[in-house]
């Protein structure tokens, strides 16, 4: 404690040196935080995915469709056991700020490829039977207060509906995850409904 006064007077003696020293320490911590966040963001997909999953997308953008013939070509590659479609929909719920991770998928294949996502059997069957059926992640359903049976309208700047209005979805299930890193904030609906209703 007797050296605190000496340290304080030394810090005040050369203010420029003190300021530059504190700034260099601050910059080091900021860089560490930013690089840690970048590492987490870039490695997040690897941590979430299993080693036995491969994602193939259009080289231009993830909102572009791959030709349907590619599905058979990919399925014929040795070692491939299952192929499923998934596309970025860019759904907006109520407010343009509420752009959600919304994906048209093939329900059975998607659930088979993502065993870490848990959906009760009766909800899965309802999803398979309901053309406009959709399932939401538990965190997304909690965020908006959605319950099974709700009718959810969504718009998208990417994929207009044939009738020009909002896309209408019936919430038939709420999925959860067995792995902590799995995403429970997505909104998934049937690819066949998307394919026939888009303009």
Task: Spell out what each predicted region is.
Residues 1-5, 40, 54, 134, ...:
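Alpha-helical membrane and juxtamembrane elements of multi-pass inner-membrane transport
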Residues 26-103, 108-109, 119-130, 142-143:
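Hydrophobic, regular-secondary-structure patches
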């Amino acid at each position: 404690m007797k050296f605190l006064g000496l340290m304080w007077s030394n810090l005040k003696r050369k203010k420029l040196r003190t300021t530059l020293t504190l700034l260099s320490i601050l910059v080091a911590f900021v860089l560490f935080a930013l690089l840690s966040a970048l590492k987490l963001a870039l490695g997040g997909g690897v941590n979430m995915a299993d080693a036995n999953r491969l994602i193939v997308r259009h080289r231009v953008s993830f909102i572009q469709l791959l030709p349907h013939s590619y599905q058979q070509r990919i399925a014929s590659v040795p070692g491939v056991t299952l192929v499923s479609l998934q596309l970025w929909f860019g759904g907006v719920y109520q407010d343009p700020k509420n752009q959600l991770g919304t994906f048209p998928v093939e329900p059975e294949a998607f659930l088979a490829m993502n065993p870490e996502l848990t959906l009760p059997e009766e909800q899965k069957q309802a999803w398979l039977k309901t053309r406009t059926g959709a399932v939401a992640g538990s965190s997304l359903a909690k965020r908006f207060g959605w319950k099974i049976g709700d009718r959810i309208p969504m718009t998208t700047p990417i994929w207009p509906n044939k009738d020009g209005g909002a896309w209408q979805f019936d919430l038939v299930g709420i999925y959860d995850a067995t792995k902590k890193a799995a995403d429970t904030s997505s909104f998934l609906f049937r690819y066949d409904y998307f394919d026939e209703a888009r303009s």
